C-alpha cells in the first residue's frame, strides 16, 4: 500500500511538472510573438556613437518620441556599412549616414527618402608622430576611411587640392570608428578621418588636424529612410511625428548647449568627460530638411568622375 501511494504521488508530481513546463513554453511563445509584434510596429533607426545622432538621443531621453504609435527604437552600430546592411535587409527603417552612402544605396535599388541634414563634419587628423602637418605630405601615406562614403569623397577633394596623384594616397578601409582611433593611438596609421566627438578625442591626444570638411561648404550628413516603407500610411505618420520630435530636440540642444547633455554623450558615444568638455562651443543643430541640390550634384559629379576613370 505504501509503495502504491509513493508511485501515485510520483506520477502526480511528474504530471504537474509536465503541465508547468508546457505552460512555460506556451507563455514564452506568446512573449516572443508579442515582442516581435512590438518590434515590427516600432520605427527602427540605425545610429552611430557620433554627435550627429545627438538630436535623436535627446529626443529619446526627453521622451519626445513617446507620441509615436509603436514607438521608436534606436539601434546602435559601430560602422556606417553595418547601418547600410541593416537598412537593406529591413532590420531598420532608417539610419543616420552620409549623402554619398545614401545616394549609392538609392542607385543600387534601395530607394531613399531623406528626413534631415545633420551637422556632421569630418576632420582629417594626422598621427602626431608621423610629422605630417600639411596635405601635400600625404604622398605615399595611409589614410583610414570608409569606401563609397563622405570620407572617400573628401579624400578625393584633399588629393585634388594639392594635385596629389590619388594612386599615391593609400586609402585604408577602416569601417569601425573605434578601430580608427585605436590605430591612430597605436601609431599604426598615418592619418584618419574622424567626426565628432572622436575628432575632439584625437585632438586632446595632440594629433594635428590637417583638413576640415567645413572648409568645403559641403553638408554631407543625413538621416535617411527606405522610401518603400515610408509610403505606408502608418509609417508616414510616424515619420511626421518623428520630424516634430527631432526639431524639438534640436531646439533644446541649441538652447541649453551640447555640454548640457554631457552624461548622455558620454554614455552613447563612449567618451570621457574631458572629451565632452572640449567639444566646440559653437555646435548648432538645424531643423529637419532635405539635402541641398548643390551637395547632391557634388556627390553625383564625383561618382561620374570615378566611372569615367574606369
Model-identified regions with their sequence ranges:
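Secondary-structure end/capping motifs
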Residues: 232-307
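Repetitive helical segments and hydrophobic/amphipathic motifs
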Residues: 11-12
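Sec-dependent signal peptide recognition
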Residues: 2-8
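C-terminal motif of bacterial Sec signal peptides marking the signal peptidase cleavage site
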Residues: 15-16
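Short, glycine-/small- and polar/acidic-enriched structural segments
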Residues: 21-165, 171, 183, 190-196, ...
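Pocket-lining segment of extracytoplasmic ligand-binding domains
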Residues: 99-100, 168-172, 176-265
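Proline/Glycine/Serine-rich low-complexity intrinsically disordered segments
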Residues: 129-136, 154-155, 159-161, 166-170, ...
Amino acid at each position: 500500500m505504501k509503495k502504491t501511494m509513493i508511485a501515485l504521488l510520483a506520477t502526480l508530481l511528474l504530471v504537474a511538472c509536465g503541465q508547468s513546463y508546457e505552460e512555460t513554453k506556451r507563455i514564452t511563445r506568446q512573449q516572443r510573438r508579442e515582442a516581435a509584434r512590438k518590434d515590427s510596429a516600432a520605427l527602427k533607426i540605425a545610429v552611430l556613437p557620433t554627435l550627429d545622432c545627438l538630436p535623436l538621443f535627446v529626443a529619446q531621453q526627453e521622451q519626445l518620441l513617446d507620441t509615436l504609435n509603436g514607438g521608436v527604437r534606436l539601434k546602435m552600430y559601430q560602422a556606417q556599412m553595418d547601418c547600410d546592411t541593416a537598412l537593406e535587409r529591413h532590420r531598420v527603417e532608417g539610419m543616420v549616414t552620409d549623402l554619398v552612402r545614401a545616394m549609392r544605396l538609392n542607385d543600387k535599388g534601395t530607394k531613399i527618402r531623406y528626413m534631415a541634414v545633420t551637422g556632421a563634419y569630418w576632420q582629417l587628423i594626422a598621427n602626431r608622430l608621423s610629422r605630417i602637418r600639411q596635405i601635400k605630405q600625404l604622398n605615399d601615406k595611409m589614410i583610414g576611411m570608409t569606401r563609397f562614403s563622405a570620407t572617400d569623397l573628401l579624400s578625393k577633394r584633399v588629393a585634388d587640392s594639392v594635385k596629389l596623384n590619388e594612386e599615391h594616397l593609400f586609402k585604408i578601409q577602416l569601417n569601425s570608428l573605434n578601430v580608427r582611433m585605436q590605430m591612430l593611438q597605436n601609431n599604426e596609421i598615418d592619418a584618419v578621418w574622424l567626426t565628432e566627438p572622436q575628432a575632439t578625442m584625437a585632438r586632446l591626444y595632440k594629433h594635428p588636424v590637417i583638413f576640415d570638411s567645413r572648409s568645403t561648404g559641403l553638408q554631407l550628413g543625413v538621416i535617411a529612410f527606405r522610401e518603400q516603407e515610408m509610403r505606408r500610411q502608418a509609417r508616414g505618420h510616424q515619420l511626421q511625428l518623428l520630424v516634430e520630435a527631432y526639431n524639438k530636440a534640436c531646439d533644446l540642444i541649441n538652447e541649453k548647449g551640447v555640454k548640457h547633455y554631457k552624461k548622455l554623450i558620454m554614455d552613447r558615444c563612449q567618451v570621457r568627460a574631458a572629451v565632452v568638455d572640449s567639444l566646440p562651443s559653437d555646435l548648432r543643430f538645424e531643423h529637419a530638411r532635405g539635402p541641398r541640390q548643390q551637395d547632391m550634384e557634388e556627390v553625383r559629379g564625383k561618382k561620374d568622375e570615378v566611372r569615367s576613370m574606369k
